[in-house]
Amino acid sequence: MKHSFYQEDELLNNELSNRGFLLTKVDDVIGWARANSLWPMTFGLACCAVEMMQAAASRYDMDRFGMLFRPSPRQSDLMIVAGTLTNKMAPALRKVYDQMAEPKWVLSMGSCANGGGYYHFSYSVVRGCDRIVPVDVYVPGCPPTAEALIYGLMQLQKKIKRTTGFKYDARQTH
């Protein structure tokens, strides 16, 4: 009886799983590890940072997602930009982003970080942090709720799990 490659893989997987082994691809394991051990660095600029603190507190407990807030960009792989980004603060944001190790992700939180928000037409406001750093996930709201932030983080985890191998992100950097 001849089997196709997929049937052989399925038979091997069933046989090994009955013995307590796991058969998977290395890319899947790497994606799972990266997605479930994010180390965010906060870049709280305004009132959205208060909602971010609420999401990290005991009611929502971001630690259950494997997140550990880090004070240094060199130890972080996720930057959460929360609040109004001014023209004076933009070079500092870019410098902190450049100090992060690859692979790195950015989550833009709130209307001000996404597109300038209420202060969109002010001369001193950057109309979206995506003009300075590449953004992976946008969380809308003014300010967004803690639930919205956690939903955005879950979407980022799904995105990270879809990436394969040791290739770094091919996003355009400015």
Swiss-Prot record:
This is NADH-quinone oxidoreductase subunit B. NCBIfam families: nuoB_fam, PRK06411.1. GO terms for biological process: aerobic respiration; electron transport coupled proton transport. [4Fe-4S] cluster binds at residues 47-48, 112, 142. Its main location: membrane. It comes from Rickettsia felis (strain ATCC VR-1525 / URRWXCal2) (Rickettsia azadi). PROSITE patterns: COMPLEX1_20K. NDH-1 is composed of 14 different subunits. Subunits NuoB, C, D, E, F, and G constitute the peripheral sector of the complex.
